[in-house]
Amino acid sequence: MLRRMLRLLWKVCKWTLLVAVALMALVVVINWRDEPLSDEARALLAEQPPANHVPDRENILVAMAGIKAPEGADVFEAGRRYMEQTARQGESAEQEQKLTWKETEPPFDCTISMGDDFLQCAELERGRLAETLAFNKTLVARYRAMQRLPHYAAIQDPGTWVVDMDFGTPFTIRKFLLAQAMLDIKDGNTDAGLEFFKKDMALWRKNLDGKFCLLDSMFATAWLMQDARGVSMLLSLPTKGEQQQEWRALLAPLSPGQQSLHAAWEGEIKFNHNYAPELKRWKSYHEVSSRGDYNICDIFSGTMEKCPAWQAWLEENIQSIFLQPNASFNDNIPFYKTWLKLTDLSWKDYLAQRDVMLAPFKKPAKLQMDWIYNPVGKKSSTHLMAPAEYIGRLHDADTYLRLIRLQLELRLAEMLSGQVADFLKQLDAPYCAPCSDFSWDAQTRQLSFHPCSEQLAGWVPPSATLPEPAAPAH
């Protein structure tokens, strides 16, 4: 009897094991097979950057990658090696014996998004700014040389390596030079200050002109807008009449190629490397997006066809956006709670607590928070930056440059508040984007974006270059 029961138990165990193995094999086979890709998806996956005929020694991107090469080393060779190494190893790639940016403690933690407080902060740190720039003279000289290069072009497919490259040092150098340039202009050394703005804004315009360039349109627009904000802050300072043309040229409209930001946002799946595996399983980027798993960059890019109205949709869906899978780089409840706490802080407290509060989260968290945090104190019910302000700085670059140029025209012409309405009527009204209406504060003598009230869906930026605004009457 016992032997019969043992034999029966053995059969049951044996067949159970065989069924389990068969089921596991079936699961492996099913998951091994991807859905057939559409022609659009196949074309996107097979997409290769155009042949790059730009010599390395004329390429801003290569210089940026090699800027931390050891003293006396060839920056371009180091940049090429670092880019190739990053393509193979991703985040684990590092330059050997690299130069590092050094500054005294506590670090200079002022950012241009602070608005007028940035100039005040730079004034308080004047001595340390000059000392730090002198101490890092090799890196500073390399950045200034990089500004003079004629081209910006990627050398490889950016989707596989661009997100892993360390470009922190060039941007740190730039922040110090930006602060120093503003102090130079404030001190009356206008030529030196303007020289920085001319070269730096030209640098980011080249980035916008590039194809398959890494920092792509969002980063290039952000840095260009920061320079433009620096110019805007300087408008309250006395400006010599003979320099008016230089200021106007600095804020010239973007070229048609530079204006094509919507196209770059719409098709740039490579920007968020988290979507790369998804593309192989879904037929197209739009099908991935249609599930509602929006990345924060998609939210602010204006590509949400579902959005009936920017503000209303965002306020209604913000919590679900941040708590959905793939909704952000930090798609979890602790990050969302930390995000709410940070956005409630004053700018001073935000700077003091940001790094500590974001320490447990992934690497992009600090950059992501700096984009979200409202530097001008106008918080919506979702604690987000005023939508029109955000679009102006990081998306609708040409309209934001146009706004600052208008401020400049008004400042240089010393216009009275009663003349502003007539001056604005001379502008090309149909050019205005839905969220880029202007309002005028006679007390502060400042133009600003009007609150967003129209739909973004289907809006395409114009390609025509703005005409020169008519000279206002005094």
PLM segments and residue spans:
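Short acidic linear motifs
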Residues: L2-H474
